[in-house]
Curated annotation (Swiss-Prot):
GO molecular function annotation: ATP binding; metal ion binding; protein-exporting ATPase activity
EC numbers, comma separated: 7.4.2.8
Class of the enzyme per the UniProt entry, highest EC level: translocase
Source organism (scientific name): Afipia carboxidovorans (strain ATCC 49405 / DSM 1227 / KCTC 32145 / OM5)
Residues the record lists as binding ATP: Q87, G105, E106, G107, K108, T109, D524
Predominant subcellular localization, coarse grouping: membrane
Name listed for the protein in its UniProt record: Protein translocase subunit SecA
SMART domains, per the entry: SecA_DEAD (SM00957), SecA_PP_bind (SM00958)
Essential cofactor(s): Zn(2+)
Domain of life of the organism encoding this protein: Bacteria
InterPro entries reported for this sequence: Helicase_ATP-bd, P-loop_NTPase, SEC_C_motif, SecA, SecA_CS, SecA_DEAD, SecA_motor_DEAD, SecA_preprotein_X-link_dom
């Protein structure tokens, strides 16, 4: 109460900071007449002036006011748009490396130009990050008009570009692209063998659009470059046949934690089935030799009992395609990890694709923390302000709207069953449609959007495709006639290709759009419809400019009339029904948002609400809930149901009370807090791998930068031999205690030389230092002979290539070991040990082991390496890019050919390991010993 009173008197911290920008806003406005008087040439010349001032020692803050004034004028001349004062404040927030929360329709894309231009003047590059290729391309093409007018270059990074195209885009002053593409380019760059092949520059300044989606929703999503493993499709299919035979009593499901576990009876039943199939070793399912079987059983159980077709995934063209839980979009190419996707393919009787091995990975949390300065924009960040600051050190500033918000947010209506809820939604749609008010219904999944669509069809509504001109003609004709069309469109993962068009036309009078969550985010819904979208569709293929202009003018007139109709679609509600002359209230027209259930996160609900009431337009929002909804069922529906019964609620009646909204908000806050804790805890683990990744990647770049790595290779060789001598000839030991034969055998195994160490050991008075010196000298002579044979230039190339290839190979193996360690480390908690500290300690030991193996493997390969003619080399294998989500186990694969893998010679010489190329761990060793590779040369390579 005291805090609320203080805020009334002094204003909130947010208000005070916004006021702090006013002086600079006034200064920019004061410059406007002077800047407006400049010719185009003089305005363009200001860019060179600003660069000169920076070179003379001025800072970006020193030139902010004139630079912002310049961008505002350039936008007026190129786009016909002038930055509002609140947009100038947004630009300052972005420049300072914080998050600007700006409501839908407030022009975030235009705001970015201010901070982008100012920071691009340094010449070090600015990255603008969006959530998909469509938005990256749209925003880059749109805003590049401003940048090119002012003499700056703009590049776009989208899927499908080759390396030279990417290098050109990154070399530009400003680069637009998606979060996935920026992250994958970073990983691919750190798998290359020449500096000139790398595409990215330094990570200096990035502005992230829809920052909450990228840095919160997808924060735990690792980007992964991977290669294929052995095919185990039949094993997945076999395990899958057992799961349908289990009954509900055989397993327990925890919906909150999203886990499923076998009961004692279920375990016994499954063990019996596995034993009969010959798949169970030992007595119990949980014996050590059955680890792989347990893993496959657990994934098959999850696939059958936790994942629902048409909600979590759909089956299309013989593939299991994941549905994004946040947007409802279909994610082609994305795959669940750890064998879960293969389990789903087996469940749906689709071809089971092989699993992949991780070659390189990074999370968005760690990728975006590499930037020297990071800013973000979104319509909904305030609810996650603590997380943004805690993890990214980003403050969230709520930017005031240019015009007051005229949207009515009504209290939720809660029904006892989903059937009653859908009936109420249908009745509300019919009322809104009768007065020509456009309606957007938000659903949580494809499954629920299609349930609602079927419900509408049963009551005489017809589904159309808003992206189909003929379908739209019917809607426009009905709108012109002022008659309800009873037509509706569904925007979900199945129809995502045209989502921008469908969303843009959701503001046409009488339009009914059903959308999963925030599909189509990034596209404004304009009342009356979108002139740009309609004009582009209507004039496609028409060459005659006069005819085009005539069509566009007709569309303009349509939209003006349509907007008036939508604004007039108010609803008069009687507060005292049946009473003559009773009180009434008017509810606004504009876009009507209906939420069909609450999401776990308040932010997602706020995003849906934010679709209505853009730029001061009127609008309405209302959520319809039932006790069957996921959030209600998991958090306290039993209590609510008892209360509804006590109130004597009849079928079809709803309870409407602000208390319900507050109770739901508290439930959502609990979920948000839990998810934040999960993300924060996972980041602590990921930071361990991230610190090691930075060391490895920096080492790679240093190696690529060095013209001559002979000194590094020699140090490795000498350190390795020192270790071998210390192992077999302990310090202060008598010569008769030396393990000379063991030293000789290990030298032969590791470096491939049979040296007379036994003869040396018999010499009178020889010490361990002398033994070490002779060994190092002989090995150095061997390498010097190779260098003389090939020439110093070839030798330098071979040394660098082997160093990089060995580092990459060991790093990949290290990633697998870290992943396995992370999966089991939680069990240490049962022994009263801190799993995180245990993970840090053991991960460090593994890293030290990697460095040790690096010395051994590099030395071994260089001692044996032979030059192979280029024409004997096979084509390079392809790699794939993946994106995992620890929330759901998703593995998002953006099919990418990399061609960065080291090439193996075509023929294997048993005496020359350098010719063996990649050898499977379970293959027979190419040396001819008859043992498996992992038990022979694979122990150290």
């Amino acid at each position: 109460m005291i805090g609320a009173l203080a805020r009334k008197i002094f204003g909130s911290a947010n208000d005070r900071r916004v006021k702090g920008y006013q002086a600079r806003v006034d200064a920019i406005n004061a410059m406007e007449p002077e800047i407006a008087a400049l010719s185009d040439e003089a305005l363009k010349a200001r860019t060179a002036e600003f660069k000169q001032q920076l070179a003379s020692g001025k800072t970006l803050d020193d030139i902010l006011v004139p630079a912002f004034a310049t961008v505002r004028e350039a936008a007026k001349r190129t786009l016909g748009q002038r930055h509002f004062d609140v947009q100038l404040i947004g630009g300052m927030v972005l420049h300072e490396g914080d998050i600007a929360e700006m409501k839908t329709g407030e022009g975030k894309t235009l705001v970015a130009t201010l901070a982008v231009y100012l920071n691009a003047l340094t010449g070090r590059g600015v990255h603008v990050v969006t959530v998909n290729d469509y938005l990256a391309k749209r925003d880059a093409e749109w805003m590049s008009q401003v940048y090119s007018f002012l003499g700056l270059t703009t590049g776009i990074i989208i899927h499908g570009l080759d390396d030279p195209e990417r290098q050109a885009a990154y070399a530009c002053d400003i680069t637009y692209g998606t979060n996935n593409e920026f992250g994958f380019d970073y990983l691919r760059d750190n798998m290359k063998y020449r500096l000139e092949d790398m595409v990215q520059r330094d990570h200096v300044f990035a502005i992230v659009d829809e920052v909450d989606s990228i840095l919160i929703d997808e924060a735990r999503t690792p980007l992964i470059i991977s290669g294929p493993l052995d095919d185990r499709s039949e094993f997945y299919n076999t395990i899958d046949t057992f799961i349908p035979k289990l009954e509900p009593a055989d397993y327990e499901i925890d919906e909150k934690q999203r886990t499923v576990t076998l009961t004692e009876g279920g375990m016994e039943k499954l063990e019996q089935m596995l034993r009969e199939a010959g798949l169970l070793k030992g007595e119990s399912l949980y014996d050590i030799e059955n680890v792989s079987v347990v893993h496959h059983v657990n994934q098959a159980l999850r696939a059958h009992r936790l994942f629902t077709r048409d909600k979590d995934y759909i089956v299309r063209d013989g593939e299991v395609v994941i549905i994004d839980e946040f947007t409802g979009r279909m994610m082609p190419g994305r795959r669940y990890s750890e064998g879960l996707h293969q389990a789903l393919e087996a469940k749906e009787h689709q071809p089971v694709q092989p699993e992949n091995q991780t070659l390189a990975s990074i999370t968005f949390q760690n990728y975006f923390r590499m930037y020297e300065k990071l800013g973000g924009m979104t319509g909904t960040a305030a609810t996650e302000a603590d997380e943004f600051f805690d993890i990214y050190k980003l403050e969230v500033l709520e930017i005031p709207t240019n015009l007051p918000i005229a949207r009515l947010d009504e209290d939720d209506e809660v029904y006892r069953s989903s059937r009653e809820k859908y009936a109420a939604i249908l009745a509300e749609i019919e009322r809104a449609n009768g007065r020509m008010q456009p309606v957007l219904v938000g659903t949580a999944s494809i499954e629920k959007s299609e349930v609602l669509a079927d419900f509408l069809k049963e009551h005489g509504y017809k589904q159309i495709d808003f992206a189909n001109p003929k379908s739209m003609a019917k809607l426009y004709d009905a709108a012109r006639a002022g008659k309800p069309s009873k037509l509706f469109a569904v925007l979900n993962a199945r129809f995502h290709e045209q989502e921008a068009y469908i969303v843009a036309e959701a503001g046409v009078p009488g339009a009914i759009t059903i959308a999963t969550n925030m599909a189509g985010r990034g596209t404004d819904i304009k009342l009356g419809g979108s002139l740009e979208m309609r004009a582009a569709a209507a004039t496609a293929g028409i060459e005659d400019e006069a005819e085009k202009q005539k069509i566009v003018e007709g569309i303009k007139a349509d939209i003006e009339k349509f907007k008036e109709m939508v604004l007039a679609a108010e609803e008069t509600v009687e507060l005292e029904p049946g009473k003559p002359g009773g009180k009434t209230i008017k509810k606004p027209g504009g876009l009507y948002i209906i939420g069909s259930e609450r999401h776990e996160s308040r932010r997602i609900d706020n995003q849906l609400r934010g679709r209505a009431g853009r730029q001061g337009d009127p609008g309405r929002t209302k959520f319809y809930l039932s006790l069957d909804d996921d959030l209600m069922r998991i958090f306290g529906s039993d209590r609510l149901e008892g209360m509804l019964q006590r109130l004597g609620l009849k079928e079809g009646e709803a309870i409407i009370h602000p208390w319900i909204n507050k109770a739901l908000e508290k439930a959502q806050q609990k979920v948000e807090a839990r998810n934040f804790d999960i993300r924060k805890n996972l980041l602590k683990y990921d930071d361990v791998q991230n610190d090691q990744r930075k060391v490895i990647f920096e080492q790679r770049i240093d190696l690529m930068r060095d013209q001559n790595v002979s000194e590094t290779v020699t140090d490795m060789r000498h350190t390795l031999i020192e270790g071998l001598v210390a192992k077999h000839i302990p310090e202060h030991a008598y010569p008769e205690q030396w393990d000379v034969s063991g030293l000789r055998e290990e030298l032969q195994r590791v470096i491939g030389l049979d040296l007379p160490v036994e003869d040396w050991a018999k010499e009178e008075g020889i010490a361990d230092e002398e033994m070490l010196s002779r060994l190092q000298q002989r090995v150095d002579e061997h390498m010097a002979a190779k260098s003389a044979q090939w020439g110093p230039e070839v030798m330098r190339y071979v040394e660098k290539t082997i160093l990089l290839q060995t580092l990459d190979h060991l790093w990949r193996e290290h990633l697998i070991m870290l992943d396995h360690l992370r999966q089991v480390i939680g069990l240490r908690g049962y022994g009263q040990r801190d799993p995180l500290q245990e993970y840090k300690s053991e991960a460090f030991e593994l890293f030290e082991s990697l460095i040790s193996h690096m010395r051994e493997a590099v030395t071994a390969q260089l001692m044996r390496v032979e030059i192979v003619p280029p024409d004997e080399q096979p084509p390079m294998p392809a790699m794939e890019a993946h994106k995992l989500d620890p929330n759901t186990g998703e593995d998002q694969v953006a099919q990418a050919q990399s061609g960065l893998a080291p090439v193996a010679p075509a023929k294997r010489d048993p005496a020359n390991p350098a010719t063996w190329g990649k050898v499977g761990r379970n293959e027979d060793c190419p040396c001819g010993s008859g043992r498996k590779f992992k038990h022979c040369h694979g122990r150290y390579a």
